[in-house]
Each structure stands twice: as C-alpha cells, then as structure tokens.
Amino acid sequence: MNFPWDQLLVKGNWMITMAQIGAPFLVIGLIAVITYFKLWKYLYKEWFTSVDHKKIGIMYLICAVLMFVRGGIDALLIRAQLTVPDNKFLESNHYNEIFSTHGVIMIIFMAMPFIFGLWNIVVPLQIGARDVAFPVLNNVSFWLFFAGMILFNLSFIIGGSPAAGWTNYAPLAGEFSPGPGVNYYLIAIQISGLGTLATGINFFVTILRCKTPTMKFMQMPMFTVTTFITTLIVILAFPPLTVALALMTTDRIFDTAFFTVAHGGMPMLWANFFWVWGHPEVYIVILPAFGIYSEIIPTFARKRLFGHQSMVWATAGIAFLSFLVWVHHFFTMGNGALINSFFSISTMLIGIPTGVKLFNWLLTLYKGRITFESPMLFSLAFIPNFLLGGVTGVMLAMASADYQYHNTYFLVAHFHYTLVTGVVFACLAGLIFWYPKMMGYKLNETLNKWCFWFFMIGFNVCFLPQFILGLDGMPRRLYTYMPSDGWFLLNLISTIGALLMAIGFLFLVVSIVYSHFKSPREATGDNWDGLGRTLEWTTASAIPPKYNFAITPDWNDYDTFVDMKEHGRHYLDNHNYKDIHMPNNTPVGFWIGIFMTIGGFFLIFETVIPALICLFGIFGTMIYRSFQIDHGYHIPAAEVAETEARLREARIKEREAVSHES
C-alpha cells in the first residue's frame, strides 16, 4: 500500500493553510463540548441510531443549514474576487475550486438535504403514517448522505477541491485534472447519491403503502403529491448519474478510457449522462419546493388551494418533460439544428404546466384574507422573482439565441433566479413554517421578517445586474477582468447584494438562537393561530410522539382538518387505545456511514486495498443486520392514553382561550 502522502496537504495558499490549522481545533472543541456535557451516549442512542423519521429529518436540516453556511462562504469569496478589476485576492485555480464546490454544495449537500429533511418531518404526518415504510433504510440513507458530505468538505483542507466546475466535464475532469480533487467529487457524490436513491424508493413506497386507507391520491396535500412524483424522478434519474460517476472513477483510478478521446472514449457521453440526471435534478429540488408554497399560500390566505387537481397534473407534466430537455444545457456543443430544435421546443413546453401552477397560486390569493407572516412573505416574493427566472429561461431555450447567452453571466443570473427563488426561498419558508412542529415553538417573527427583507432585496441587488453583465459579454467562470472591460460598477453592486443576503441569513440564525430561549412553548400542534389545514397540524408539537397518531385518522378531502375545526371535531376524542408497535433503533446506518467515509477517503487517494477492507466492513455490517432477530417494541396503551390526554387538555384550553378572546 503506497499512500500518496505528498498529496495530502494543500500548500501555497494562506486561506487553505488557515483552514488546515483551524479545522483540528474546531473538531477538538466539538469533541470537548460533547464530552464535557456527557452527551455521547444520548446522541448515539437517541439520534445517531434513531429510526424515527422526525429525528432523521432534523439531522438532515442541521446538515443543510451548515452546508448553506459553507456554500454561502464560497459565494462571498467569489463575489469578493470579482468586486474590483484585476483582483489578486484569489489565484485562478483556487477560484475554480471555489465556484466548483459552491455549485455542488448548494445543490447536492444543501438543497437536497433541506428537502429530504422536510420530507422526513412532514410527509409521514401528512398521510397519517406512524413511520416511513423502511425505517432502517431511512437511517442508512442519512448516513450515506453524511459520509458524502464529510468527504466533499474534507477536500478543501486535505488534497485539494475539485476545480472542473460542478458539471465536471470530461476531458477537463480527466487527464487535465491530476490529484485527488476530482476524485473527491466522484466518490462523495456517488456515496451521497446512493443514499438519495434509497430515500426516493423509501418515500415512494411510504406514500403508496403507508398512507391512511381513506386518503385517495387526489386528496393528498400538495407537498405529499409533489414528494411522490419527485421520488419517481429520483428513481429514474439517479441511476444514469451513478453509472457516469462509476465510469469516470474507473477512468481516473484504473486507466480505462470511457471519456478519453485518445483511446476511443467520448467526452460528450459524460455531458449526456450528467444532464440526463442534471436537469431532472433541478425538478427533484424544485417540485417539493412548489409543494411547500402550495401548503403555505392557502394557509395564510385562509382559502382552499385553487385548482388542486390541475396542480397535481401540472406537477406530473413537469416531471415528464424534465426528462426531455437535457440537451438545452449544451446547445453550443454541435448537436445539429434538428436536435437543438426538438429540445428547444420541449424546453419551452415546461412553461405551460409551470404557468398553471403560478395562476393557481394567484387565484388562491384572490379574495383571500391574507396575513403576512414570514413564510407567506417568502412565498409571495417567489412568484414575481421566479417569473423573471422563467422568462429568461425561455430566452435561453431559443437555441440560436443561446449561442449569445450560454457562457455569460446572463445564464448565471437565470439559474439563480430559478433555483434561489424556487428552492432556497421555499426551504427558508418551509423551515419557519414547520419549525413549531419540530421544536414546539415558533421562530421570532420580527427577526424572520428582517431575514426575509435583507435576503430578498439582497438577492435582487446581487443577481439582477448579472443579466446586464451577461448581455455586456462577461463570461462566467472568469476569475478576473480588466478595468477597460467596464464591468466594475455592476460587479460591485452584485457583491453588495451578496453581503445583504448574508446579513439576512444571519438574522435567521439569530432568530433560531433567540427563539430557543425566549419563544413561548406550544403544545397544541396547530401552531399558526389555528390555521393548519393538513394532518400534521393535528399532532402534538415539539417532535410529535414516536407513534405520530394514536389511531388511524380518517381523511376524505385535502382540507379535512379545516372542516373538522369548523364543526368542533378533532382526532383527540377519547378512544379505546391499543398497544402500538414501533421499530427499534439500530446502529447499522451509523457504522455503514463510517466504513463508507474511511473507504471513500482511501479510494479518493487511489489506495485500493484499505478501501476494499472497508467494503468488506460494509458487507459485514449488512450480514450482521440480516441475522438479527428484531421484532421492535410496543408502546403500552396506557402510555398512549396519557400522552393523548395531555394533548387533548391543551387543545381544550386553547379553544377556551380563543372563545374568551372573541
């Protein structure tokens, strides 16, 4: 075994050197805090090995917020470099590494875990399930994601980050990118992608088989509908990515030639593989985001969602078309007029079902009794901003015009107007909206609104000038420019906008910390002044009981809970409760994640034997699990009755208080 020790440390960059010095102290400090407060046993037994979908969801969200910080720092470094002409703040290769990792982190390790966290917390509650279909697999999926996240972030201080862009095109990512950087990209995304594929299968089966029997597909809440359709995209889109990553890994480590022209390979094969996954990936994160908006807008408009069935069909239409547009990402690569024309038309067609959704949200708002809580503000801001992203997308869909726009900042502005307003706004809105369901108290609304205004205004100040920069010819991925180019003022404005966005995010962090100590606790579960419309608001707050529902709820309309409250009925009346069967926690996912992290690290540095040993460790863990006799455990009926009685008493007090105020 010849480990390449000479590649381990990145040298010659003061910023990376500071990170290399600071990272060990950060890890030691974290270990010291956990040890001092004697939290190791608690964390291992209650969180790391938990199969409770709600706790797994919270772990996803914690990781997503941390990756938001990391990706945001990358973005600020990019803007700092481009603020003034001929800047020497970053050298070219380091700049390439930063924009490459920024894209991967924000899409793979921020947006997706944010969405998966909300899936885990909300979807089983919305369909009346006690857990997901495969609780152990859910735990394994999280740790696979976590292993990929850790590996990818190690690249900054050990070995060097990938510098071939988030698309990692061959041959740039092949013979022109020596060292472990691209290997980090391939292995980390491969491991995380396996967890994503498992999550997609898990939630597909959960929604199909674990929903309450009286709930029909067209009666499901829109967040659950968009989740179900998204799982189909995950199941169909991730295998091509898995194959592509595996092929490029063998090219780099075992000297095959799938993407190397000199030996008969096809670099364009990578582009097709990548975007067959890459464009559906956009809808993997944006369709659940549409589902979030479809929950928030009716809640704070105090109206039924307009055109529920058309929203379902529009979601299905977008999912179908998402697999027919991938070539628009490389119109400029010589496909020919006929192929470009087909994919140009199919790209424009996506605007039709998306337009249906936009009009339905607007008609839901029409004559509604709207209140402007912070989740609603994000949802309202999404509509006009996303529309701008969509209109510029149609401009880019015109293949002939795309030759002018494609490699400029016009494209950068376009996809940020779609992904930030479509996904990031939704993630922040969803986090605030369902935060009481996780923690039992609302985040401070004043701080939330400061977060919204800084983030939304900063976003437009940052990215609107980039449309003009693109039309003025500024290429994307450019690490510096000359004063004579005339781009200084717009780049300065763009950087100011990025700083405003960072301040907005800091307000959210302050809100989380402040609310932990100051916000009043709520036990009733229907936390937004009794405006909840779906099943999750019928359960207790502060991580609902492990069993979620003491009895199987009835559900015959997507607004059933509103009807029940109007008629004074709820699910918490006295019942003859029975013992409830639940799955046991398991360490399997945690140890598979550890083996994956260690094995992946050795494979990144092309040291195969230790990686194989870790692979045997993974198989051994799986064999150990297969021979376990684990029948789970039962929550006694008396304990269920006591828990439900407390919740019923809290609900009665809430209704009495509301009646007294009125």
UniProtKB/Swiss-Prot annotation:
Q: What does the record say about how the cofactor binds?
A: Binds a copper B center. Heme A3.
Q: Does Cell wall biogenesis/degradation show up as a keyword for this record?
A: no
**At which residues is the cross-link 1'-histidyl-3'-tyrosine (His-Tyr) found?**
279-283
Annotated residues that bind Cu cation are located at 279, 283, 328-329
Q: What reaction is this protein's catalytic activity?
A: 2 a quinol + O2 = 2 a quinone + 2 H2O
Swiss-Prot/TrEMBL keywords: Cell membrane, Copper, Electron transport, Heme, Hydrogen ion transport, Ion transport, Iron, Membrane, Metal-binding, Oxidoreductase, Respiratory chain, Transmembrane, Transmembrane helix, Transport
Give the E.C. number(s): 1.10.3.-
Give a Gene Ontology cellular component term annotated to this protein: plasma membrane
Q: Please list the residues that bind heme a3.
A: 414
Q: Which residues form a coiled coil?
A: none
Family annotation (InterPro entries): Cyt_c_oxase-like_su1_dom, Cyt_c_oxase-like_su1_sf, Cyt_C_Oxase_1, Cyt_c_Oxase_su1_BS, QoxB
Q: What pathway is it annotated to?
A: Energy metabolism; oxidative phosphorylation
Q: Name one GO molecular function term.
A: cytochrome-c oxidase activity
Chief place of localization = membrane
Its required cofactor(s), as named, are: Cu cation; ferriheme a
The record's subcellular location field reads:
Cell membrane
Q: Origin, by domain of life?
A: Bacteria
For this protein, the parts annotated as crossing the membrane are: 14-34, 58-78, 103-123, 140-160, 187-207, 228-248, 273-293, 311-331, 336-356, 376-396, 415-435, 451-471, 493-513, 587-604, 608-627
GO biological process annotation, one example: oxidative phosphorylation
Indicate how the chain sits in the lipid bilayer: Multi-pass membrane protein
The task this protein performs is described as:
Catalyzes quinol oxidation with the concomitant reduction of oxygen to water.
Q: Which family does it belong to?
A: Belongs to the heme-copper respiratory oxidase family.
Q: What is this protein called?
A: Probable quinol oxidase subunit 1
Question: Which organism is the protein's source?
Answer: Staphylococcus aureus (strain NCTC 8325 / PS 47)
